[in-house]
Amino acid sequence: MPYPRKRFGQHWLKDPAVHEAIVRAAQLPPPQRDPAWVLEIGPGTGQLTQRLLAQGVHVVAVEIDRDLCRLLQKRFADQPRFHLVEGDFLRLPLPPQPRLLVANIPYNLTGPILEKVLGSPAQPVRQFERIVLMVQKELAERLQAGPGSKAYGALSVRVRYLAECELICRVPPSAFRPPPQVESAVVRLTPRPAPTPARDPRWFSQLVCQGFSARRKQLVNALGGLVDRQTVAAALAQLRLSPTARAEELDLPDWLALSDLLLEQTPRMAAVSGEGKPR
C-alpha cells in the first residue's frame, strides 16, 4: 500500500467501523436493475470504494494522485460499475450521473469543495440528494451550530440556507494512517430541494457575512458598512428583535426576514451588492 502524500493532504482511513458508518449514512438504495450512481472524491486506496461497490451502485471516483489511479485501475479492473476520473476535483465539471456523494477530503480544501457541491445562496447546486463528508471536527461543529453557540457563524447560516446538516459520528486521529493532528467527524448534508429564498440571495449573503465579521458588536454597529444605524434599528424593532442583538443571536428565519426588510429600505445598496465569503 502506498504511503500517504503530505502534499495531497492524504490520510488513509483504516477503521472499518467508520467506513461502514459512512456507507450507512449515504442511505444507498437497494440493488436494482438501474443502479444508483455515487460520486466519491479522493478514493485513496479504494477501501471505501470497495464497500460502496458491494452495495450494487456505480461509483465515479475522482482521484488527483496518478500513482493511486494506477492502483485503483488495477484493483477494480474487473468491476464494470467502477468509473475512475483522474484529475483535480475542483477543476473538473461535476459528473452528471451521481445523485449521492461521499468523500474523505483534504481538510484544507473543505471550503472550496463545499462551495462546489452545495453552491451558494445565489447559485445553489441541486444535483445531490445526500452528501456525506469526513471533515475536521471543528468544521462539523460550525456546520451544525445554532444561534448562541461560539461555533455559530456566517458559514453556519449560509450552509443552513442550502442544506440540513447532521453529525453522524466523531472520528479520532487513531482511525487514520498517519494520524492527523486534529479530530475528525462524519457529517451528512441533505440539500434542500427548494430553499426558502431570500429576495436577493447575494444581498442576504453579504449581510450575513458583514454581521459576523464583527460578531462582538451589536448589529446596529456591525452592519454599519452596509446600512445606517437608524435603518437597522428600525428593522430590528419591526421584526421584534432585540435592539442590542448580535449576529450570533439570529437564526436563519431571522436573517432572511432582516435581509428582505433591509432590501426594501436600502434598494440602492442591495443592487450593487456582491456575494460575501463565509467566515
Swiss-Prot record:
Its main location: cytoplasm. NCBIfam families: ksgA. It comes from Synechococcus sp. (strain JA-3-3Ab) (Cyanobacteria bacterium Yellowstone A-Prime). S-adenosyl-L-methionine binds at H11, L13, G42, E63, D88, N104. Pfam families: RrnaAD. Keywords: Cytoplasm, Methyltransferase, RNA-binding, rRNA processing, S-adenosyl-L-methionine, Transferase. GO terms for cellular component: cytosol. The keyword Cytoplasm applies. This is Ribosomal RNA small subunit methyltransferase A. SUPFAM superfamilies: S-adenosyl-L-methionine-dependent methyltransferases. Belongs to the class I-like SAM-binding methyltransferase superfamily. rRNA adenine N(6)-methyltransferase family. RsmA subfamily. It catalyses: adenosine(1518)/adenosine(1519) in 16S rRNA + 4 S-adenosyl-L-methionine = N(6)-dimethyladenosine(1518)/N(6)-dimethyladenosine(1519) in 16S rRNA + 4 S-adenosyl-L-homocysteine + 4 H(+). Its EC number is 2.1.1.182. It is found in: Cytoplasm. It comes from the Bacteria. Specifically dimethylates two adjacent adenosines (A1518 and A1519) in the loop of a conserved hairpin near the 3'-end of 16S rRNA in the 30S particle. May play a critical role in biogenesis of 30S subunits. The keyword DNA damage does not apply.
